[in-house]
Amino acid sequence: MTTSGAGNWSDRIYRYCERGFDAAFWAEPLNAMSNAAFLLVAVAGAVHLARRPRVAGHPDHRAAELARTGLVFAIGVGSFLFHTLATRWASVADTAPIGLFMLGYFGYALRRLLGFGWVPTFLGVAGFVLALRYSGNIPCVPGLLPITRAGGHPCFNGSLGYIPALVALAVVGVALMLKRH
């Protein structure tokens, strides 16, 4: 729900997290402040990459690792912006780096960690994109669970959109465990 027309990037969004209908900058203090963790992890990752010696005869994947580290930093900044400003443009600043990170890391996990070829990796990422695209729009069925009473609306306020990432994480984790990676 926004306060004005659907096409304005500065429209306020009041449908998410602990904000309610409070337009104040610090209406979501826990969500806003917790994003510092992403910034700290990104800085620590960049320092680690800078200090790690190159090993002769091994491929150097620093560019991809640095890109993922940059996305972690962008997640922290974008999420802070969304949870303080709560506008349409800040929502994109929040979700775009998260989506790019998920896709990039899933492709990395399939290709580098699990050893898939390029075609299976591409197909896996494409399937992941489709799952992400449609899972957040699954309508609630009244009476399914006590919290699904909003029949016809996206279930759990669209939070089912996170299920493909959780499933992918679990499947990759189990596969790595079975490979003893």
Task: Put a short name on every predicted segment.
Residues T2-H181:
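Multi-pass alpha-helical transmembrane bundles in non-GPCR membrane proteins
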